[in-house]
């Protein structure tokens, strides 16, 4: 999955019954750090001191699933800046014969002709702000804006096939592949 917070990654997973195949940094954070409240709205309690533990658990789960040859959905933004690419970190662990797909949940919110124009990004941010307000656990909008900026400059590795969450047939093919894995 790819996209800033509130772009629909977790909703996509739930709507398609992929929870049993999913690893999520946020779910690990909730188990370790709990929930806090911001103006009466629940937020995932982000504790910088536990982030190394969150990622240790995340990668242990990922490595175990890969060793067991299980299809795995990663419910994280999978975006970063300053030359770090979380997808490359994941690819280092994936067996060579695996095909890695990324479902981009942010692309459908952008203008297809000029996706990173100010108008397109502002429109997408309005949608993200509304979704963020309506979701179970909100995220500070400054963080969402930062991840939107990361998306603009983010490069997907060549080995990865990117599918828009709006491309229903391709997305369904991937979902079927995961759900029908034997």
Predicted regions and their residues:
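Conserved substrate/cofactor phosphate-moiety recognition/catalytic segment
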Residues: 10-70, 111
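Hydrophobic anchor at the beta1->P-loop junction of P-loop NTPases
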Residues: 1
């Amino acid at each position: 999955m790819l996209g800033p917070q509130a772009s629909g990654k977790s909703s996509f997973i739930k709507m398609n019954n992929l929870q049993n195949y999913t690893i999520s940094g946020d779910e690990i954070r909730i188990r370790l750090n709990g929930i806090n409240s911001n103006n009466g709205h629940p937020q995932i309690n982000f504790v910088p001191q536990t982030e190394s533990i969150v990622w240790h658990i995340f990668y242990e789960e990922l490595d175990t699933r890969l060793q067991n040859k299980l299809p795995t959905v990663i419910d994280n933004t999978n975006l970063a800046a300053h030359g770090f690419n979380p997808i490359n970190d994941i690819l280092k662990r994936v067996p060579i014969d695996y095909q890695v797909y990324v479902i981009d949940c942010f692309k459908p919110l952008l203008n297809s002709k000029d996706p990173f124009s100010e108008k397109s990004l502002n429109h997408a941010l309005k949608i993200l702000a509304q979704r963020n307000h309506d979701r179970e656990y909100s995220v500070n909008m400054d963080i969402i804006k930062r991840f939107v900026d990361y998306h603009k400059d983010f490069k997907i590795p060549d080995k990865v096939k990117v599918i828009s969450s709006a491309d229903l047939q391709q997305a369904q093919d991937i979902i079927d592949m995961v759900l029908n894995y034997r």
